[in-house]
């Protein structure tokens, strides 16, 4: 019985010494068991290393074990395991059930138990207790020593949960974490390790469970050799926590205490002092780094480095791209093998997708050394979303998460049809399970004939029944059961009914054919995982009564704990992983990416359930548990040391200055430390681009990424920029390569690509727009905004996906409709706006809105509390609006005469006929919200009012550009009709926009009701263009003095109009505008019918027509594409507009 330390710094050859010692023992033919004990993740590499040292004939004489493997060997020999092991998934499900049962008895964790991740946290603390040999009884016995209610209640809660967990677990199972405790108890009966010589390698520390096992082994074995990565032995002295080797020296002290307690001999240690060490014999730089990284004071290395390099990059993507280039260069120039290279990071989750994408492009074989979560696997999504559908009352999200797994008998086209219908009509809850067919109209009557509508509805219902039949059956079967076991049985039947096992097998075969070995391996494990989880539910809580929601939560908890381990598909590949897994691989070239503050070294972990103070207090009372976060932080530097000293040939550290979102990243303190040691270190960056052939050569690596760089340079050449000659040679190489020549020629042709198609044939455009052309004025304005957007909307009739919601345009139409009905009711009752009873008016608004709510097409306003609030808001706005209209009417002599005046074949007036230069007539249709008339001095003055639910300004500049034509063409049409039909002398009075709103008035505490009303009137002042006639103006606002608070006019003290502060036009100017608008519309319509579909959105200083355009994904407008330019519209002053309009009309002889 003896213990021997084998110690030395990193790279000194401790592992090799162990292997050679084993070889020597075999050659000496000493008859005793020879065992190499390593951590679980090192066992595979250790076996490979041992085989390389020993020949095939002698290799079998040595066992490579981990603590877990050792436990299984002993249990097989002497017994000890009579129950199955429960995995992490089963533990989590059991803990969920225990916490649910005891939630009312918990003192501290009652609220926390509802939080996501709490079960995992509790599972982790129980695992920690077990590893530190703490039982529920030990916790309870120490409660009286705990001061402070918070910690005491925490420990009481933990003892309650832990105790019930142990009791219920051991009915049918055993915890994996109990293996080492049982191993320590059973080792006395085992003969396997009697007189054995054991070498223990690659450990930096042990848990109390492992120390217990080591103690038993020390008492049975001939000798235990333990490697320690340290510069010298501590020999039981106090350990300085700032020492990089402090974790190792703490381990040494504990082992010394064990042999002292058991009177075990300490053999003379083996000191592997080396200069240079075996690992660094070919690199003085890496040897210097090992010696000085954590030495104080350190020794500078002044020579230029080639084995240690740094890279500063713009972002994470360019960092990995540069890493890929460097790997290719090493393999080509220095004959490096992919298997000798590792890429590691402290943020594998953040880098995983980038590395996968870039390495695939550079054709670098790689394996990401991590376990995969299964939560996003379609099979798991199908199962959980099916239960979520039933437990969350058939929400849209859960239903389509279930349907979109691709594991049901419904194709993508059927899925899209069903989803569009569901979104458009807000289908949810009972509507899915109701046997009645869905009858909501999918389209408006003018879009599809009734027969087509019926056929489409029939198809939608067929898809619905086919898609929902399995889950509806599942729902019925669930309703008649209440035990966990029964839920598992019904769920299993459901999975078999949809042929899931066969579908999984077919998918596995497809993955194999496509060469996706990792995917095939993943899917191969999933079904067994699901069955294992269901089995554990049955065995642990099978007879307990639970609800569907509880079953869903338990199953979700169980499946969330599973991770899939994948086997590397080949040996020669770059290993990608986290820093903690690095030492399990033999590598000579190491790339550490993401060497940034907070990533490497790792940041302090959260304290968890037990704070650092809690842990210190418990430790002082004799309850030793895992280290606090500060101790772990000190130990992190040993992990940094181990990482930096892993490679034997080449080390590169890289750090981006920004993450994927553009947020600034700072370099790690490790960067500055190494720069101080290596004053002339090899350092590169990709932030400042240098010119020259040498720099361009870095972009030539694998065929695919080089091809992308080539295309980029060829485009520069086409655009007239100078490129390096090397790209000409590269171009020739691709031209001579059969695989690439077609792609190259296709992309070069793409340099001439334009998304423009300025005109299409007149015949085709006629078929799309119809003949004769009949359009609304708003469509004419739309064409002015962008011809292509008009073509897509009205020619191709492309529509945005219909969603069950109330948009602002919908709300505006709704309010217009109510106001129209109210206006007609007012006429019907023989009432006037200026004398109506306001209480009656408000009741009428309520009545009209309530009647509309009973209409099936407005179901949405009854669908939620949110829309109930919207309805209340609409009522307030409309009540405020009718009050405001009444106030406007009171203030003037104009009288409302027409409401929703229409221009159409069956309208109040016929369509507005516009004769084109070809002689063809275009019919304009539309509707005016309100027309007020004034009879004065033998003339009839018109005030045209357009209700707007949002803010709207009148701009002469927009009239000039054809963006604001509606009110003027309506004015022209009405005046024309009055003259031609009735011989009435009509005159323009005003064109106004009235905003429908109920504005909030601030600081009303000291304001009277009258002052509040004045403030509201002023806030809702109309915008537009007024006839520059003081008398007519007073007929619109008979109390005007200075600036009007209802119309955009200011009068001077002498009664004249202040033209600079008013939006006014003379009778002659109105006439000019009428001519200009007719001319503009004719020009636009002719352009439209000529087939102009140019992608030419307007752009002004306050925005462009692209800002809210839903067709941007269709046109792909981009000013970098040839021919893509904005139609720049410069805002003109009113004087400039008048001048420009007159000049244009004169030029056209109009």
UniProtKB/Swiss-Prot annotation:
InterPro entries in the record: ADDB_N, DNA_helicase_suAddB, P-loop_NTPase, PDDEXK-like_dom_sf, PDDEXK_AddAB-type
Pfam families per the UniProt record, alphabetical: ADDB_N (PF21445), PDDEXK_1 (PF12705)
Sequence positions that bind ATP: 8-15
SUPFAM superfamilies, A to Z: P-loop containing nucleoside triphosphate hydrolases
Residues given in the record as [4Fe-4S] cluster binding sites: 786, 1106, 1109, 1115
Biological processes annotated in GO: DNA recombination; double-strand break repair via homologous recombination
Enzyme Commission number, as recorded: 3.1.-.-
Cofactor binding: number and manner: Binds 1 [4Fe-4S] cluster.
Reported cofactor(s): Mg(2+); [4Fe-4S] cluster
Gene3D superfamilies membership: 3.90.320.10, 6.10.140.1030, P-loop containing nucleotide triphosphate hydrolases
Keyword Thylakoid part of the UniProt annotation: no
UniProt KW keywords: 4Fe-4S, ATP-binding, DNA damage, DNA repair, DNA-binding, Exonuclease, Helicase, Hydrolase, Iron, Iron-sulfur, Metal-binding, Nuclease, Nucleotide-binding
GO MF term list: 4 iron, 4 sulfur cluster binding; 5'-3' exonuclease activity; ATP binding; double-stranded DNA binding; helicase activity; metal ion binding
Top-rank lineage group of the source organism: Bacteria
PANTHER family to which the protein is assigned, alphabetical: RECBCD ENZYME SUBUNIT RECC
NCBIfam families with a match to the protein in the record: addB_Gpos (TIGR02773)
Subunit structure: Heterodimer of AddA and AddB.
Note: Despite having conserved helicase domains, this subunit does not have helicase activity.
Function: The heterodimer acts as both an ATP-dependent DNA helicase and an ATP-dependent, dual-direction single-stranded exonuclease. Recognizes the chi site generating a DNA molecule suitable for the initiation of homologous recombination. The AddB subunit has 5' -> 3' nuclease activity but not helicase activity.
Family indicated by similarity: Belongs to the helicase family. AddB/RexB type 1 subfamily.
Designated name of the protein: ATP-dependent helicase/deoxyribonuclease subunit B
Native source organism of the sequence: Clostridium botulinum (strain Hall / ATCC 3502 / NCTC 13319 / Type A)
Higher taxonomy: Bacteria, Bacillati, Bacillota, Clostridia, Eubacteriales
Gene encoding the protein: addB
């Amino acid at each position: 019985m003896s213990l021997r330390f084998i110690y030395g710094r990193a790279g000194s050859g401790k592992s090799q010494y162990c292997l050679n010692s084993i070889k020597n023992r075999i050659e000496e033919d000493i008859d005793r068991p020879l065992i190499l004990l390593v951590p679980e993740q090192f066992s595979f590499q250790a076996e490979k290393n041992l085989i390389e040292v020993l020949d095939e004939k002698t290799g079998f004489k040595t066992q490579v074990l981990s603590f877990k493997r050792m436990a299984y060997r002993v249990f097989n020999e002497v017994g000890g395991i009579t129950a199955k092991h429960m995995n992490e998934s089963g533990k989590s499900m059991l803990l969920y059930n225990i916490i649910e049962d005891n939630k009312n008895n918990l003192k501290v964790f009652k609220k926390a138990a509802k939080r996501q991740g709490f079960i995992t946290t509790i599972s982790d603390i129980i695992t920690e207790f077990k590893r530190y040999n703490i039982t529920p009884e030990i916790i309870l016995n120490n409660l009286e020593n705990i001061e402070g209610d918070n910690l005491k209640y925490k420990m009481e809660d933990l003892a309650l949960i832990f105790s019930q967990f142990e009791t219920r677990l051991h009915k049918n199972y055993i915890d994996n974490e109990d293996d080492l405790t049982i191993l320590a108890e059973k080792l006395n009966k085992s003969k396997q390790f009697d007189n054995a010589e054991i070498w223990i390698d690659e450990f930096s520390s042990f848990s109390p469970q492992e120390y217990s096992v080591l103690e038993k082994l020390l008492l049975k074995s001939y000798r235990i050799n333990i490697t320690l990565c340290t510069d010298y032995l501590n020999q039981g002295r106090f350990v300085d926590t700032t020492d990089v080797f402090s974790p190792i020296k703490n381990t040494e002290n504990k082992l010394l205490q064990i042999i002292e307690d058991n009177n075990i001999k300490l053999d003379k240690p083996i000191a592997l002092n080396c200069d240079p060490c075996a690992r660094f014999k070919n690199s003085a730089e890496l040897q210097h780094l090992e010696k000085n990284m954590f030495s104080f004071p350190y020794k500078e290395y002044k020579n230029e480095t080639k084995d240690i390099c740094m890279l500063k990059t713009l972002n994470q993507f360019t960092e990995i791209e540069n890493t890929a280039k460097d790997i290719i260069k090493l393999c080509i120039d220095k004959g490096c093998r992919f298997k000798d290279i590792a890429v590691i990071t402290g943020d594998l989750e953040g880098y995983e997708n980038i590395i996968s994408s870039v390495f695939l492009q550079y054709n670098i074989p790689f394996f990401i050394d991590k376990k995969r979560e299964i939560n996003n696997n379609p099979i798991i999504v199908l199962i959980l979303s099916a239960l979520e559908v039933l437990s969350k009352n058939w929400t849209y999200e859960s239903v389509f998460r279930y349907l979109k797994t691709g594991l049901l008998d419904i194709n993508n086209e059927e899925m899209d049809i069903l989803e569009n219908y569901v979104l458009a009509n807000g289908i949810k809850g009972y509507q899915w399970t109701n046997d009645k067919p869905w009858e909501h109209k999918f389209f408006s009557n003018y879009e599809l004939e009734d027969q087509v509508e019926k056929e489409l509805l029939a198809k939608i219902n067929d898809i619905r029944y086919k898609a929902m039949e399995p889950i509806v059956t599942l729902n019925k079967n669930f309703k008649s059961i209440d035990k966990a076991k029964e839920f598992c049985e019904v769920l299993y039947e459901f999975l078999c009914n949809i042929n899931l096992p066969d579908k999984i097998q077919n998918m596995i075969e497809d993955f194999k054919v496509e060469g996706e070995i990792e995917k095939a391996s993943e899917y191969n494990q999933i079904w067994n995982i699901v069955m294992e989880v269901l089995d554990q539910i049955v065995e642990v809580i099978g007879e307990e009564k639970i609800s569907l929601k509880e079953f869903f939560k338990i199953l979700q908890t169980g499946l969330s704990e599973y991770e899939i381990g994948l086997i590397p598909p080949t040996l020669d590949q770059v290993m990608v992983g986290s820093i903690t897994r690095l030492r399990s691989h033999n590598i000579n070239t190491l790339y550490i990416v993401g060497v940034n503050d907070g990533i490497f070294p790792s940041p302090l972990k959260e304290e968890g359930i037990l704070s650092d103070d809690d842990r210190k207090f418990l430790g002082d009372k004799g309850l030793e548990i895992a280290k606090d976060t500060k101790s772990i932080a000190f130990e992190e530097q040993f992990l940094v040391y181990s990482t930096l000293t892993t490679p034997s040939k080449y080390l590169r550290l890289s750090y981006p200055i920004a993450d994927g979102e553009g947020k600034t990243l700072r370099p790690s303190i490790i960067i500055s430390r190494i720069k101080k040691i290596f004053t002339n270190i090899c350092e590169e960056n990709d932030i400042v681009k240098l010119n020259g052939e040498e720099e361009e050569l870095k972009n030539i690596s694998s065929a695919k990424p080089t091809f992308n760089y080539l295309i980029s340079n060829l485009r520069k050449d086409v655009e007239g920029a100078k490129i390096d000659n090397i790209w000409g040679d590269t171009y020739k190489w691709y031209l001579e390569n059969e695989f690439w020549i077609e792609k190259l020629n296709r992309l070069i042709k793409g340099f001439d690509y334009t998304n423009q198609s300025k005109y299409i044939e007149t015949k085709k455009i006629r078929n799309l727009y119809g003949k004769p052309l009949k359009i609304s004025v708003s469509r004419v304005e739309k064409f002015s905004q962008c011809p292509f957007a008009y073509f897509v909307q009205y020619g191709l009739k492309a529509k945005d996906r219909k969603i069950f919601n109330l948009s602002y345009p919908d709300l505006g139409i709704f309010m217009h409709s109510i106001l129209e009905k109210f206006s007609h009711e007012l006429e019907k009752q023989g009432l006037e706006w200026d004398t109506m009873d306001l209480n009656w008016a408000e009741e009428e608004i309520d009545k009209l809105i309530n009647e509309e709510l009973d209409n099936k097409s407005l179901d949405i306003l009854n669908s939620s509390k949110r829309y109930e609030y919207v309805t209340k808001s609409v009522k307030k706005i409309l009540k405020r609006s009718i009050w405001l209209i009444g106030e406007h009417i009171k203030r003037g002599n104009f009288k409302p005469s027409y409401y929703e005046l229409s221009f159409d074949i069956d309208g109040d007036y016929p369509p507005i006929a516009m004769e084109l230069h070809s002689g063809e007539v275009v019919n304009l249709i539309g509707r005016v919200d309100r027309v007020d008339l004034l009879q004065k001095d033998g003339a009839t003055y018109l005030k045209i009012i357009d209700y707007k639910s949002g803010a709207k300004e009148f701009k002469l500049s927009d009239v000039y550009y054809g963006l604001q034509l509606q009110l003027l063409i309506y004015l022209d049409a009405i005046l024309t009709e009055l003259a031609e039909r009735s011989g009435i002398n009509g005159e323009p009075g005003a064109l106004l926009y009235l905003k429908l709103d109920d504005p909030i008035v601030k600081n009303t505490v000291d304001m009277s009701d009258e002052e509040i009303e004045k403030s509201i009137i002023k806030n809702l002042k109309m915008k537009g263009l007024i006839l520059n006639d003081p008398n007519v103006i007073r007929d619109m606002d008979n109390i005007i003095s200075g600036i009007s608070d209802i119309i955009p006019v200011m009068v001077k003290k002498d009664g004249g109009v202040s033209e600079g502060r008013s939006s006014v036009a003379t009778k002659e100017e109105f006439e000019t505008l009428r001519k200009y608008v007719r001319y503009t519309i004719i020009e636009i319509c002719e352009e439209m019918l000529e087939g102009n579909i140019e992608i030419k959105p307007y752009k002004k200083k306050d925005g462009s027509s692209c800002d809210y355009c839903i067709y941007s994904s269709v046109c792909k407008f981009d000013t970098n594409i040839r021919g893509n330019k904005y139609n720049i519209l410069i805002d003109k002053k009113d004087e400039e507009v008048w001048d420009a309009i007159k000049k244009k009309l004169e030029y056209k002889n109009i």
